[in-house]
Amino acid sequence: MATNIAINGMGRIGRMVLRIALNNKNLNVKAINASYPPETIAHLLNYDTTHGVYDKKVEPIESGIKVNGHEIKLLSDRNPENLPWNEMDIDVVIEATGKFNHGDKAVAHINAGAKKVLLTGPSKGGDVQMIVKGVNDNQLDIDTYDIFSNASCTTNCIGPVAKVLNDKFGIINGLMTTVHAITNDQKNIDNPHKDLRRARSCNESIIPTSTGAAKALKEVLPEVEGKLHGMALRVPTKNVSLVDLVVDLEQNVTVTQVNDAFKNADLSGVLDVEEAPLVSVDFNTNPHSAIIDSQSTMVMGQNKVKVIAWYDNEWGYSNRVVEVAVKIGQLIDDKAMVKAI
């Protein structure tokens, strides 16, 4: 039985999630909530500067949009509590506005009748379970939680990488740097921002800033709590990022042993290993959370290791959002079947 979903927010992640969800037979997209007219949403779904022309036909209609004959209702209400999730029988709301990334705010969707909510970003507080596929998705708990967070794109990258290294060799400590493509949190031209470096034009500079990825990692991989720290460098490219992770391991290793650990990891669809000498544009629209650049793996002093992992911070992340939504829906169905027996 397909899971009924609604998407709140039609920004970069909301639109990518919609594209991917419409290709997943386990999901039934019933509604989107956005402040733009259907003509605008249809156009931005059909034509995307980063990910190309959509392979489906999206048309604006009076009630919303139609995608290859599938009608999706367009709502436009900034207050989630007013949305008709109960009457539409919505199982999972994918919260993609970035404005409700706190359990106390996201609960408005539950109050409106949705069964569960999945945030497309790290939670800023409240009763929320953070899930990273390939790290702790086997612990997804719909009995205890109504609201879930898919963490950040960077946490989805570093999570599987750190898990493999820690499980196989043991991590003593380490530092990470994410070299991250620009996002709409930055400014095209110099303008005020609470982070004075992000106030500067994103197209002109490499911009050092903070990342919560290493800190958030402890929520999904508690074994590394207090062992990793990091920062971000925002660079003037439109998409695809990388994590540069340097760790001291408990065991002595070789480059081959490190790369083999990633190749042999049971993380199909989440983590991949690339042996060709590629650059960032080659990973555009790659669905994995992390792609190890095997040619860049280094070992010094037998146990100090440097690993580079690429990730499409839009498309890879949006694939994980859809997959976690599917898993939440399956658990809802399983629970309903048990009750019916």
From Swiss-Prot:
It catalyses: D-glyceraldehyde 3-phosphate + phosphate + NAD(+) = (2R)-3-phospho-glyceroyl phosphate + NADH + H(+). It is found in: Cytoplasm. CDD domains: GAPDH_I_C, GAPDH_I_N. Keywords: Cytoplasm, Glycolysis, NAD, Nucleotide-binding, Oxidoreductase. The keyword Membrane does not apply. One of its GO terms (molecular function) is glyceraldehyde-3-phosphate dehydrogenase (NAD+) (phosphorylating) activity. GO terms for biological process: glucose metabolic process; glycolytic process. GO terms for cellular component: cytoplasm. D-glyceraldehyde 3-phosphate binds at S152, C153, T154, T183, R198, T211, G212, R234. Pathway: Carbohydrate degradation; glycolysis; pyruvate from D-glyceraldehyde 3-phosphate: step 1/5. Pfam families: Gp_dh_C, Gp_dh_N. Its main location: cytoplasm. It comes from the Bacteria. The record marks H180 as: Activates thiol group during catalysis. Its EC number is 1.2.1.12. The active site is at C153 (nucleophile). NAD(+) binds at R12, I13, R78, T120, N184, N313. Catalyzes the oxidative phosphorylation of glyceraldehyde 3-phosphate (G3P) to 1,3-bisphosphoglycerate (BPG) using the cofactor NAD. The first reaction step involves the formation of a hemiacetal intermediate between G3P and a cysteine residue, and this hemiacetal intermediate is then oxidized to a thioester, with concomitant reduction of NAD to NADH. The reduced NADH is then exchanged with the second NAD, and the thioester is attacked by a nucleophilic inorganic phosphate to produce BPG. Belongs to the glyceraldehyde-3-phosphate dehydrogenase family. Homotetramer. This is Glyceraldehyde-3-phosphate dehydrogenase 2. It comes from Staphylococcus epidermidis (strain ATCC 12228 / FDA PCI 1200).
